[in-house]
Amino acid sequence: SMLLTMIINKIIIKSDIILLIIIIKTYEANMTLRELKTGQSATVTVVGGEGALRQHFLDMGIIPGTRVVLTKFAPMGDPMELNINGYELTLRLADAGRIEVEDITDREAAECEVKAAAERAEGRNKDKTAENAALIPHPGLGEGGKYHDKKAEHPLPKGTPLTFALAGNQNCGKTTLFNQMTGSNQHVGNFPGVTVDRKDGVIRGQDKALVTDLPGIYSMSPYSNEEIVTREFILREKPKGIINIVDATNIERNLFLTMQLMELDVPMVLALNMMDEVRENGGTIRVNQLEELLGIPVVPISAAKNEGIDELISHSIHVARYQESPKRLDFCDENDHGGAVHRCIHGIMDLIGDHAEKAGIPVRFAACKLIESDQMVLKRLELDENEQEMLEHIITQMEKERGLDRAAAIADMRYSFIRRICAQTVVRPHESKEHIRSRKMDQVLTGKYTAIPCFIGIMALVFWLTFNVIGAFLQNLLEQLISFLTTVTDHALVSAGVNGVLHSLIINGIFNGVGSVLSFLPIIVTLFFFLSMMEDSGYIARVAFVMDKPLRKIGLSGRSIVPLLVGFGCTVPGVMASRTMPSERDRKMTILLTPFMSCSAKLPIYVFFTAAFFPHSAGIVMVGLYVLGVLLGILMAVIYRKTLFQGEAVPFVMELPNYRMPGAKSVGQLLWEKAKDFLQRAFTVIFIATIIIWFLQTFDAHLNVVSDSQSSILALVASLLAPVFAPLGFGDWRISTALIAGFMAKESVVATLSVLFGDVASIRQVLTPLAAGSLLVFCLLYTPCIAAITSVKRELGSKWAIAMVIGQCVIAWIAAYGVHLIGVLVGLS
């Protein structure tokens, strides 16, 4: 019995050990990315999520087997910053919880580094001639016959216009390159159906060569408007060539997009940008060998220093004119992981060949997108039921053989190819000076206790310089110029004996109306100068990282903070600044919430009424108005989140670029575009609106010129609206007239009241302090000025603009009525 007891005890002990091992293994297997500690390394084992979100994870390089290091958390604990394949990436904790990882010990991390170094050394030693490739000048046009073989050429007829697509990741210098290639020969517009900027430019020295600057993207998956726009442009407009710019300091990440562009089988040139930084930090890239491995021309450039641009243009013109498609479209073979992915891709290509040709989609590109479950491609191919079943069977078989799901298998295939070619062609630089500088700056600008004070300080400085120093000074000069021109024109019209109505139209309608709006131009240009400096330097990405958590609680993202803050200065640039937001949902919400941030044009109204009715508590009243606007904005954000903008929150997967000094040419080009855009609106929509307001103020219902504004159509309309405001305590028609004039420009409210009432004493006879408080709340919240509404119309369309006008007026009425009602209940008068 003792022997039996001992055997049983040993069995129990062994079973406990086995159970403990199982528990430990289960724990390790189920460890997620969000459980990592700062500085901890791990290997991705499972990528969770579904649909576009999961595909975006994979596109950004988060695939099984990838090593990640948790760099830090945002000051408020969410999101986190990761280092993946040498670049920084942000991820929310909720999204990180969908990614399972396996912890890497310090020893394992060192072994991985040694192994990676050995692989790089092996790749460098594969071909001794490649060791000296960096010393060999890059081949010129026609040399070597590598890409200019007569057999590969399909020349276009002479005189055929050449069109190019300029594509690349965000923050890779694409805009700088576009400006260098085109100079001032640019046209800015929108892609059809979306509010994504489209820039077209004529290549300098090539009158019949047009290049389109496509949005910065990371892949050709239909994850964002930018990616859809890029893909549809290439597939439908069929440019004669693609210029793909990549950041040479982060080449692995950038080549992921390159491979997908090559699958489109369009003549293509690769521009290796920032090669000067690579060399300065002790690294190099064997350009000739990279060309051989990719099968496309590769041109080293520095867009910021205007180096290599002429050679890039020459190669681009050549491959487009002779239609030299990429020599390589296959990035895996039958030896890669048993050939599962290779067989799958080629099997699908055989299956869908005719459909792809009919749909105008390159067959290799279509096959890969079908494996990734791209529904847009599947719909365009119009496969029948049997073909779809066969497609699913081929993909399922590949998943079993490869041991990865379909989307992960394709992403792994691409990144595996990238790692192989980089091992042979890239000599790793030391940690760059730019990265070292960025890490030091981030210790302060994204530090736990310093990030928010720094942000507040920077924005306060921007606002002070814009609205009190530089912008205000330039605005004052422009106002003086407009006033001078108005006076000169007025005297000229009087001297010429021009008809009084025409005189009034020119002076009161055009000069005073359009002139009042034009005076905002210096403010907008100055503000966008600072915003572009912050954006191009990489700081705005850090602001989004820091502010994401509090804004996400009300349905926004970290990127919303800057447009909303700009809205305190002026709603127009606030709305325009929202264009930098990648999410259409967040962009719309941000635009709709911007009017709740009290703009500086309303400040004269606050000062006027607080001085007249609340002289001893003016500061408290004004601060209260700003706070009320923010609180109501938060409330509306929550309502929007539960009604108009329901659905899954857009993940915060964003690359944090190194800090860089923005190029003067790029900043200048941006400021010119913004100024030109504003001027175009000032002399179109705003011009028409001012004429309408002038007409209503000048004529009565019988179209007779009025001598007293009380008889005008505007006064008639105001008298009809007056009963609407009676419950709020300000039912006088003159108040209604001022509010209507405020639709033109908020500064007009005080000016109109001064004209109609004469002095403050007359206003005190009509309004009680309670009614004045109610009126202040209404002015805080009612419809923005015509310039702001025009901006909203341009960004969101007419329906949203009209809805904003009506919605803001309704919200303002309800809030003002609430203030009036509460005042009456507590005995105020």
Language-model features: where?
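Conserved G1/Walker A P-loop phosphate-binding module
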Residues: I136-S219
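Conserved C-terminal guanine-recognition region of P-loop GTPase G domains, centered on the G4
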Residues: R231-P297
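Alpha-helical transmembrane helix bundles of large polytopic membrane transport and channel proteins
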Residues: V269, R279-H430
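Extended, low-charge hydrophobic alpha-helical regions
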Residues: A408-A409, R428, A472-I510, I554, ...
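Core alpha-helical transmembrane segments of integral membrane proteins
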Residues: L445-F545
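Hydrophobic core segments of alpha-helical transmembrane domains in multi-pass membrane transport
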Residues: C454-L465, L527-S532, T610-A612, L625-I639, ...
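Juxtamembrane inter-helical linkers in multi-pass membrane proteins
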Residues: Q480, F484-V488, A541-T571, Q646-L670
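Transmembrane helix-loop junctions at the membrane interface of multipass transporters and ion channels
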Residues: S600-V623, A787-G797, G818-S829
